[in-house]
Amino acid sequence: GSEMCIRDSIRPDDIIKNYGADILRLWAASVDYRNDIKIGDNIVKQLSEIFKKTRNTARFLLGNLYDFDPAKDYVAYEDLKPLDKFALHKLNELIANVTEAFEAYEFYKYFQCLQNFAAVDLSAFYLDIVKDRLYTAGKKSLSRRACQTVLYEICSALNRILVPVMPHQAEDIWRNTPEAQKAGKPESIILSDWPTTNEKWNNPEIEADFTEILKLRETVTKAIEVLRGNKIVGSSLEVAVTVTGDKVALLNKYASELKSVFITSQATVSAQKPEDVLSEHSEHGYTAWVTKAKGHKCERCWKYSELSTEAGYLSLIH
């Protein structure tokens, strides 16, 4: 009731007044009730930041689905890029893990899974990489629609996963999704079904490959960060990367995707160290050599290319 307080320090109604009911519910879901339960101003503020990040992720998803019509633009799984398939594999894992956590009344695991997916799998990896496809690829190109298909599935599942703990935020998201505009869909997200895993998205081979790709990306990022720290380059798009390592077959398999994964203008697989190396780093069985990107900067995507500067080609890389 109104007189209830937690450790005589923070009143639940004060949390609701200052942060909203979803934050109080998020706190309840974040603690392991089998151990001592802690709460304080700093904890509530941290949860508020997590809430905002989740909201910003949802805003990014919705902002890039404004022109996506699932009935016309949805891309079949077989036509998705490997990175897209990896994202759906991680989404499948999230659905399975949070469902298991709820069924076992281990709500804190739900919180951990949700936070890791939003911060690590999405914001720090998938969404960071696909921005180029979303912003510069042709509006109805296969590349952009494939990415939108994944964002659509993520938004749909993530929205439902938010409902038990953050229903107000979930409702706000639902009202702006392409799915909610379909005829016959529930007026409220609360009336929709809980998400289920999709067997087609389960892809252990892709997961194994991208576990290594993530290690390679970390190696490359550390080499580039040295240049950023010394203010030799400002953006990763200003560099070209040459990589080598023990798993050459894997590197060659994804050679055409690497510049997108690294967010660099060029990426090459070669055991031969290039000339004019500005920075290098070795880790996880991989070595990355960083040089200045060759060519001229595209006005549209900011990538460097050796395409002719005549006839406006640099504005038409994508």
Predicted regions and their residues:
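Short, small-residue-biased leader/transition segments that mark boundaries at the very start
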Residues: 1-6
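Core structural elements
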Residues: 49-62, 84-93, 112-133
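Acidic, turn-prone loop/beta-hairpin segments
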Residues: 68-96, 128-223, 230-245, 271, ...
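Short, non-ligating residues that shape and space the ligands of small metal-coordination modules
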Residues: 307-310
